Swiss-Prot record:
Functional summary from the UniProt entry: RNaseP catalyzes the removal of the 5'-leader sequence from pre-tRNA to produce the mature 5'-terminus. It can also cleave other RNA substrates such as 4.5S RNA. The protein component plays an auxiliary but essential role in vivo by binding to the 5'-leader sequence and broadening the substrate specificity of the ribozyme.
A Pfam family recorded for this sequence: Ribonuclease_P
Species of origin: Prochlorococcus marinus (strain MIT 9303)
PANTHER family: RIBONUCLEASE P PROTEIN COMPONENT
Keywords assigned by UniProt, alphabetized: Endonuclease, Hydrolase, Nuclease, RNA-binding, tRNA processing
TM stretches of this protein: none
GO molecular function: 3'-tRNA processing endoribonuclease activity; ribonuclease P activity; tRNA binding
Subunit details: Consists of a catalytic RNA component (M1 or rnpB) and a protein subunit.
EC class of the enzyme, as a word: hydrolase
EC number: 3.1.26.5
Catalytic activity: Endonucleolytic cleavage of RNA, removing 5'-extranucleotides from tRNA precursor
InterPro entries assigned to the protein according to its UniProt record, in alphabetical order: Ribosomal_Su5_D2-typ_SF (IPR020568), Ribsml_uS5_D2-typ_fold_subgr (IPR014721), RNase_P (IPR000100)
Annotated protein name in UniProt: Ribonuclease P protein component
Family: Belongs to the RnpA family.
Length: 128
């Protein structure tokens, strides 16, 4: 299932800020970047949504898999997982999260991948 609009991270300025200044947490199959939310970087139509809520994005390059079907399956799996985890996150969770998958992610089963995602979210302090 796809992330709701209020939880989606959009805009090149947001991604640039996360890439440059975000705190990085490394796993074997993914890198999690976290930064405190800055609603001023959001485009005007998206600012009216809950600007201080957690917003997420998942980046999967063609190095992970040349097949779009596999990349989209991984993206949907992670979106669904992030949605279930961050919807129950504390109200003070006003961070932006970017998950970048490494090429080894396509060879890993679903449950270890999601467990690693949870571990990185705990390291980042987004889950208790």
């Amino acid at each position: 299932m796809v992330l709701p609009a209020s939880m989606r991270l959009r805009g090149s300025r947001c991604f640039e800020r996360l890439q440059k200044w975000g705190y990085r947490f490394y796993g074997t199959s993914m890198v999690l970047r976290v930064i405190e939310a800055d609603p001023q970087l959001l485009k005007a139509p998206h600012r009216h949504h809950n600007s201080t809520a957690c917003r997420c994005a998942v980046v999967i390059s063609s190095k992970v898999s040349k097949r779009a079907v596999i990349r989209n399956r991984l993206r949907r799996r992670l979106h669904n997982h992030l949605r279930s985890r961050l919807e129950v996150a504390p109200e003070h969770c006003n961070h932006w999260v970017l998950i970048s998958l490494k090429p080894v992610a396509s060879a890993i089963e679903a449950s270890p991948l999601l467990e690693e995602c949870d571990r990185l979210l705990h390291q980042a302090g987004l889950l208790s």
